[in-house]
Amino acid sequence: MTPPQMVSQLDDARLDERQRAILDRQLHGLGGETKQRKNVFAYATVSDRIVLSVSSICAVLAGALNPLVPVIYGLLVSVYDGFAAGTVSASELRSKTATFSLYYVYLSIGLFAFTYVATVGFYYTGERMARALRTTYLAAILRQNMAFFDLLGPGEITSRIMSDMGTVQEAVTSKLAVMLTAIATFCAAFVVAFIMYWKTALIISPFFVIMIVTETLGGAYMVRHHKRAMELYSQAAGIAEEAIAAIKHVTAFGIQTLLSQRYLSVLEQAAKADRKAENMVAGMIAWMNAMPNLIYALAFWAGSIYLTRGQMSVAEVSATTLAVTIGSFAIIRIAPSAQALLSGIAITGEILKSIARRSPQDPLVKEGDEPSTVVGDIVLDRVGLIYPSRDDVDILQDVSLRCAAMKKTAIVGSSGSGKSSILGLVERFYEPTSGTVLLDGRDIQSLNLRWLRRQIALVDQMPVLFNATILENILYGCSDMVSQWSESEQLDRVVQASKKANAHDFISALPDGYHTHVGEKGLQLSGGQRQRVAIARALIRDPKILLLDEATSALDSKSEAMVQEALDAAAEHRTTIIVAHRLSTIQNADHIIVLDHGKVVEEGTHHALVAQNGAYAALVQKQQIGDTHDHKAPDGARLSIEDDDDEDSRYGGNTEYVDEKDIRTEEVALSSAAHDEGTQRDSLKLSALQTIAFIARLSKRDWKVLLFGLANAILAGLTIPVQSVFFAKILTVIGFPPPQYPQLRSEVDFWSGLYVMLTGTTFLFWMGVEIALSYATQKLARRVREVCFRSILVQDMAFFDVPGNSPSALSSVLSKSTNDLAGLGGPVMGGILTFLSTILAGIVLALAIGWKLALVCTATIPIVVACGWLRLQVLSTFDSKVRQSGIESAAYAGELVRTVRTVASLGLEEHALARYEGILAKQAAKSLRSILLASALYAASASVVYLCAALAFWYGGTLIASHEYSTFQVYICFVSLISGSQIAGSIFTYAPDASKAMHASREIQDIMNLKPSINKVAPTGPPPAHEGTEKNQPQQNLSACRVEFEHVSFTYPSRPTRRALDNLHITVEPGQTLALVGQSGSGKSTCVSLLERFYDPDQGRILIDGQDIKLRDVDEYRRDISLVSQETIIFSGTIRDNITVGLAGQEVSDDEILEACKQANILEFVQSLPDGLSTLVGTGGSMLSGGQKQRIAIARAFLRKPKILLLDEATSALDSQSEAIVQEAMDAIRKDRTTIMVAHRLSTVQNADVICVLQDGKLLEIGTHEQLLGKRGKYWEMVSMQSLH
């Protein structure tokens, strides 16, 4: 999975050969790939190989036992003929029949034993090999350099681990076992045929060669197109996961239909490639089913000639022909298993390519120097940097600077100037294209990467915490040393680090203290709490170098003060490099470096640079807050603020930490809510019939195609009873005495001709089955994916607040669950229907010919069916457990990939892999018992058929001895019913498919049945029915836009014990700007969420021009609103796509787009790119800096020309210069619209018409900037804390 090149290659004239080589190896890995393992079996251990060898031998022996049937059958025919000729007495007939019937019993016992051992062994080793492959793949991913991830499709890793690995595991377990058994049956049958009479076997052998060649060539063609289809399905999975991860912005912009169309477009491309593969498979299956009829025709025709010449006996002709029959049906069974195996091979090839890629920045290798001491002196010497994924832009140009040991160095500058890139170079996330980065005089490229990162601690603007306890998260900072400490020592060290980070007090106040789970992404904690836990995590390793990248920019003033105090303490006695936009945080730095467009423009201390009145002084001036000189803060103003650090939710309940005493209560409430909304997908139990009915309803549009395919399936099933009539008739004919040989030859020619005709009809029937039903199945899978994706995208935010509805889990439903449901689609249903028609027709035929023997044989079929049904139930339970484990492991792997920079920075690769292996091993231990039971039932369903044969022959011989039945009657009953019994057993080879489909249908039905209370049911579906008459009143367009919160109270569904807003009443007049300020957790962003109708108030109303917003059409309402949030979302695609994303379906000229870019202060950057607006931004905007992404989001909002503008920390990621320009543009466009701002940086709100100070969801203060300063209250304290002096 080497990332593709996404941007144009740099002009060769700009780069020398060395620079091109540096970029190339970061994109494509080092030359001379590691020794690549050829297939999944290379991941088997010695014990696995022993078990696999024994299992393979048992599978071969099980397959080889089947052709012994013709031998026993030939002996019985000889006895029957002898009785008819008078050479065998009735008592002798009964005795020999009983003996030969016992042979069938012995055959059944042997087949059961061998099948059981083979099945258990393959399931056991297959699970272990797939587990090893999963682990190795994830290890290979975690080894890769950052450029690899910059171009990696969103959701691709999760899709590989969840869906593709499941296909591989299935291929090397049940499918491989079935295929080996079938191959052994075919080979043994071929040998038996040669032993019986080699000439006849030699005559028909070309047909076997044709069948093998057909499978080989057809399989290669199928793999090629199936591989392309899998690549496209992986791409579609990436689109889905990216959309679900950004669901709030998707909802706000109303782009559900746009993303659904993009998703569907890729699915259609995948379906085209898949259809080519399926058409070839259809031809192969039809040919394999038709070919045996030609073999019958030729075998009987040739056999009759040798019989009349006296070179063969009747027993040899019948035994040879029956052996050929068994061998041909074995080849038919090979095809579907080979298809699954080849699919697994194709997928494994892509996985092995990723595993074989050699990373130029591998954290797990032992190479590189490890100096015994570190001083911490960092020097960049004439460093140039070009990102491999954006090789047309110089990020750093000839930068030389020094970060002195044990000193605090700050780097400031405009957005995109290269500040964070310097930190990336120090961490060795990227390689410089020129110059060197030195640590204590050593080139860091010569140092061991893992050792280097252990000396460094990084604290980001948005710190990543993992879904674990606070204790575990802090210990992740020194994961390599934890094993050396006792539990008490671990806790002591964590407490010490927490005290240094100013985090111990709030952690101790929690009910579970350091053992409190922080939730996914740490969202159970506030922003300030997360930041302080991240600082503690950084300090526990006692790093020599501390990197702080906008560590306080996302915090309110009070949280910033507490975190800044912790950072100041952390910076003591170590080299510290700070990247910051808020200059108040770096005034005390020992050295300040100012960057502009990748170059150093100024250096010095804060006071020296201010005195120069240059670029730095201009930045300082822009961050001053007016009028504070008239209202000085008293001494200790910072300390006067209460330690209330709970953070407001970012459009969701997950980010707001509740009162600590209520945590357990809320967890129970969450579980209950999840159950009530139907999100507990495993709680719904669907039977196989319900699953089939569900699939039928989904396939209603294609009923004509389905009807055609299923009709052909019934006709195809009837060909086997017809074969039994032909077979029994010919066996009777070839028993004629020598005087009747001319008649024998004539009738054999006639029946052989009928076999040839049956070949053509069988081929046509099976082609109709496979082509029609595979087409319908593809349509089913595409429709399910589309409907589920649309359903997910229109759900209310409360749905996504439920922990089980993570992007990875929902993406899994769209990929693996859809595939599993399709596994019980057309071809499988057609196969089952074919087998049922064969069984029923066989029973009817046998009853018509010889009802006594037919009733006895038919009575045994339910036993076979019961064994298969029990196996299905066991597999259903087993698959449920495996599925849950797969979701858990895939979700964890997805979390690691999404947070790979944090994983790399902390050196967590080995720890993460160990935990991942633990998740997989835990499930493997649980599944062993189910494997043992399921294998026993499967072996029983495969071997009981020979007990049926024993009974049939014994009772048939008794009827012949008593002259009640002729040999023809016994032959036709035996062939039709024993074949029917075998086919009844074959139905349950589809048990794994049915089991997976049953579980998948539960998940998919839950998704489809979800009914959002706010959003429309589906973008293209009918609008939801409204209750009452009030909601049916005419819609009004947003015009004057007077916004009023009328006594609004609200509690997040996922946080039912605490009110986010409490009786809030605020009015914003048309055209006014309202600023919402306050501490984290005060309810500011909740107001934005309610205005966007992500949620509806519990009490009160929100009015627009006097009308409740709940009475408006939600899509029309949101079109007149633009949201710019701190959490900037950039979608994969071009800059143009991202700016126009909120105007889906509307014609927008480039001039309009460029004007919006100019307003957002990003025009110069866009025009500097070779591809301009057509430049690809990478996954999640990975090609852009944080400020550039924010300005694109602002340009997007400007272009929508909204009537209501919502700004939630819209400029928090911008440098002072960009912020001033963008703020000026915002001030200009606010004149014609109502604006509601949420801000921590108070310099951005001082010109607002109304400023509301919120606390604990209530309105604390209201007024203008000057009025609130005059009150010397809460707002005055906040302003005083942010002023620069």
Curated annotation (Swiss-Prot):
Family annotation (InterPro entries): AAA+_ATPase, ABC1_TM_dom, ABC1_TM_sf, ABC_transporter-like_ATP-bd, ABC_transporter-like_CS, P-loop_NTPase, Type_1_exporter
GO biological process, one term: transmembrane transport
Domain annotation ABC transporter: ranges: 380-622, 1043-1281
Lipid bilayer topology: Multi-pass membrane protein
Induction section of the entry: Expression is positively regulated by the fumisoquins biosynthesis specific transcription factor fsqA.
Keywords for the protein's UniProt record, in alphabetical order: ATP-binding, Glycoprotein, Membrane, Nucleotide-binding, Repeat, Transmembrane, Transmembrane helix, Transport
Pathway membership, UniProt: Secondary metabolite biosynthesis
UniProt binding sites for ATP: 413-420, 1078-1085
Subcellular location: Membrane
GO cellular component: membrane
PROSITE patterns: ABC_TM1F (PS50929), ABC_TRANSPORTER_1 (PS00211), ABC_TRANSPORTER_2 (PS50893)
Primary subcellular site in the record, as a coarse category: membrane
Region (Disordered) location: 627-654
Location of the ABC transmembrane type-1 domain: 54-343, 713-996
Superkingdom of source: Eukaryota
Glycosylation sites: N467, N1037, N1138
Residues spanning the membrane: 57-77, 102-122, 176-196, 203-223, 281-301, 312-332, 707-727, 753-773, 831-851, 855-875, 931-951, 968-988
One MF annotation (Gene Ontology) recorded for this entry: ATP hydrolysis activity
Family the UniProt entry places it in: Belongs to the ABC transporter superfamily. ABCB family. Multidrug resistance exporter (TC 3.A.1.201) subfamily.
Biological role: ABC-type transporter; part of the gene cluster that mediates the biosynthesis of the isoquinoline alkaloids fumisoquin A, fumisoquin B and fumisoquin C; as well as small amounts of fumipyrrole as a shunt metabolite. The products of the cluster lead to a brown coloration and are important for growth and conidiation. FsqE possibly plays a role of self-protection.
Listed name of the protein: ABC-type transporter fsqE
Originating organism: Aspergillus fumigatus (strain ATCC MYA-4609 / CBS 101355 / FGSC A1100 / Af293) (Neosartorya fumigata)
